[in-house]
């Protein structure tokens, strides 16, 4: 059997996340059906990140096994012909047997977009979080610095997370203003807890609004109390940008 790695981009608006669920359309299910149709057999696809409802991806990674003779780099073209416009296979390649989309990953990079304007955006409504009050980006940038390094991020895990350890390392976090009232939070690390990036984004929004002071962040991290951090920011602002191997 050959192992094929896929790099996938998708708009998560119309999907109930990545992972297959009963009675709900998911990205994994749509890709598996396309592959099964292409190859004429049932195909299982294993993804790296189980993105939630409404979350988008530029660089989701998945793998599948096949006996097909199709060249590894040609699968992307063949599968894309069978996929809806909001899911695109950006790259496909044959990889060694020991590669695993999830367990071989060394880290991930996420982006969270905030549309900071008194008026909502018709175009970006499903691709960013709308915040009306003007945010103090300088304070958000100061606050972001406290997250870097290895910490116990229990205060930034949503209910339902099931992991042995809540310690994670953040490699980098940047907050900057893009064009057209858009603020971007970029964060990379060796792993993330359930809803961790969205809770960090919600906390930085609180700092930008003045509901929290940037100097309070170390205490919130050390306190391990979810109620002290900000609200979980909406899913539509979150993007899985890249997975590191």
Swiss-Prot record:
Pfam families: PseudoU_synth_1 (PF01416)
UniProt KW keywords: Isomerase, tRNA processing
Reaction catalysed by this enzyme: uridine(38/39/40) in tRNA = pseudouridine(38/39/40) in tRNA
First-tier enzyme category under EC: isomerase
Isomerase in keyword set: yes
Residues holding substrate: 110
Biological process, per Gene Ontology: tRNA pseudouridine synthesis
InterPro entries, per database record: PsdUridine_synth_cat_dom_sf, PsdUridine_synth_TruA, PsdUridine_synth_TruA_a/b_dom, PsdUridine_synth_TruA_C, TruA/RsuA/RluB/E/F_N
An example Gene Ontology molecular-function term: tRNA pseudouridine(38-40) synthase activity
Enzyme Commission number, as recorded: 5.4.99.12
Active-site residues, as the UniProt record annotates them: 52 (nucleophile)
CDD domains, per database record: PseudoU_synth_EcTruA
Presence of keyword Lyase: no
Self-association and partners: Homodimer.
Family: Belongs to the tRNA pseudouridine synthase TruA family.
Record-linked PANTHER family: PSEUDOURIDYLATE SYNTHASE, TRNA PSEUDOURIDINE SYNTHASE-LIKE 1
Biological role stated in the UniProt entry: Formation of pseudouridine at positions 38, 39 and 40 in the anticodon stem and loop of transfer RNAs.
NCBIfam families registered for this protein in UniProt: hisT_truA
Protein name: tRNA pseudouridine synthase A
Native organism: Ruminiclostridium cellulolyticum (strain ATCC 35319 / DSM 5812 / JCM 6584 / H10)
Lineage: Bacteria, Bacillati, Bacillota, Clostridia, Eubacteriales
UniProt gene name: truA
